[in-house]
Curated annotation (Swiss-Prot):
GO biological process, alphabetically ordered: tRNA modification
EC category: transferase
Catalytic reaction annotation: adenosine(37) in tRNA + dimethylallyl diphosphate = N(6)-dimethylallyladenosine(37) in tRNA + diphosphate
Quaternary context: Monomer.
Organism: Psychrobacter arcticus (strain DSM 17307 / VKM B-2377 / 273-4)
Region (Interaction with substrate tRNA): 58-61, 182-186, 266-271
Name of this protein: tRNA dimethylallyltransferase
Pfam families for the chain: IPPT (PF01715)
Gene: miaA
Record carries keyword Metal-binding: no
Entry GO MF terms: ATP binding; tRNA dimethylallyltransferase activity
Similarity annotation: Belongs to the IPP transferase family.
């Protein structure tokens, strides 16, 4: 993803004459970095070298018609720089980590057959974890079971599924929060599909694509300065508001029978816009294909303060002229809009914080080491980690590198 309208081009000549001879033809490169850090710009330059194919590692870019809020490359960019795993499902659909891993395995083989190095670029750390650390062999959800469980959840609520989970999988029931809709739903799906609790599946040995002895994996983690990243995040969000994120969400609601519990509607930015639309009682929720009650229930607590405020002003407003009421409504909507923007900024910063935490864990960097790293002097830190303790028969190694800037990552790849 990239900040549109303000591209950060790396200071370099064409990469075509500077490709690193250390990257073998069987290499797989993961470019891991927090949101708004400039991953896409480097990916584009590497693609221009002619040696790479791009594979998106972003759980939001998989959705069609979700463009502004995901900072998705525009149509011209996607035509110039094709990405695998972008625009592959509708916002109504789900896309599991297991499905992602399966797709990536197929795409890696295809890239190598084409004489290209797969460049996996994005910020969804759960996806990277599945690729590098492994995934328990939990079966991919059956569509009919998934639809059945979703209907059950809509009819009786997540509490019914949580109670059922307590009867069939006590371990997962105790581990999961009662409001964790996504994981509870998945656990129930797995049990109904296999008759085996998901906790049993999760105890089985992990399987990771990075264990493949016929491939050389390079995992590059870029962890930029926090103040710099926070500025980039603010710039990105400003652009999203100007490009029409609110209008995009309204359009999605008009087009699809969405619910607030769908993974697509839990994406940062989209979630905050939904809450805003509920707070201002937007007429889009009157669409016949939408369950208005679900949206208002999902944001009941935040909407309550707005309702209480309106009730407190009711007596005063009863004596107002229509013009005064219109002004009051405009002020209320403006306040709700500002709250939406503040919440989206906070949520995006929290997302970046989680991404930093995971990257430090993977790179085996303590908070202190990360803070003391310098941009200008030291070479990027490197560690080579074997996975013999995870898979006794595997002797392959995963090469890990950490950087402060995209320039350092570029230097490694050039």
């Amino acid at each position: 993803m990239t900040i549109k309208g303000n591209r950060m081009r790396l200071s370099s000549d064409s990469l075509s004459h500077h490709l690193s001879p250390s990257l073998a033809d069987n290499s797989v490169v993961c470019l891991m970095a927090p949101t708004a850090s400039g991953k896409t710009n480097l990916a584009y330059e590497l693609y221009d070298s002619g040696r790479y194919e791009l594979i998106s590692v972003d759980s939001a870019l998989v959705y069609r018609d979700m463009t502004v809020g995901t900072a998705k490359p525009n149509a011209a960019e996607l035509a110039r720089y094709p990405h695998h795993l972008v625009d592959i499902i509708d916002p109504m659909q789900s896309y599991s980590v297991a499905e992602f891993v399966s797709d990536v395995a197929r795409l890696i083989d295809s890239c190598h057959q084409n004489g290209k190095i797969p460049l996996l670029v994005g910020g969804t750390m759960m996806y990277y974890m599945a690729l590098l650390d492994g995934l328990s062999p939990v079966p991919v959800s059956d569509d009919s079971v998934r639809a059945r469980v979703e209907q059950w959840r809509q009819d009786e609520g997540i509490s019914a599924l949580y109670d059922y989970l307590g009867k069939v999988d006590a371990i997962s029931h105790e581990r999961l929060n009662a409001t964790d809709t996504q994981r509870i739903t998945r656990a129930v799906e797995v049990y109904l599909q296999t008759n085996i609790p998901i906790s049993d599946w999760q105890r089985q040995p992990k399987q990771a694509l990075a264990h493949n002895p016929n491939q050389q994996w390079h995992a590059l983690a870029v962890m930029p300065d926090r103040p710099w990243l926070h500025t980039r995040i603010e710039q990105r969000l400003d652009i999203m508001w100007r490009e029409g994120l609110v209008e995009e969400v309204i359009s999605l609601l008009e087009r699809y029978p969405l619910t607030p519990s769908l993974p697509s509607m839990r994406c940062v930015g989209y979630r905050q816009v939904l809450e805003y639309l509920v707070q201002i009682n937007h007429p889009v929720f009157e669409q016949s294909h939408l369950d208005k009650a679900q949206f208002y229930d999902a944001f009941a607590q935040s909407n309550l303060s707005s309702v209480e405020s309106n009730e407190q002003d009711a007596t005063t407003q009863s004596g107002m002229t229509q013009t005064h009421l219109s002004v009051a409504t405009d002020q209320t909507e403006a306040l709700a809009c500002q709250q939406m923007q503040n919440k989206a900024l906070y949520a995006t910063r929290q997302l970046a914080k989680r991404q930093y935490t995971w990257l430090r864990k993977v790179m085996q960097l303590s908070d202190t080491a990360a803070e003391q790293a310098t941009v200008s002097s030291a070479a990027p830190s490197t560690s080579i980690i074997g996975f013999d303790d995870m898979t006794a028969s595997q002797n392959d190694k995963l090469i890990l590198h950490s950087f402060i800037t995209m320039e350092q990552a570029r230097a490694y790849l050039c």
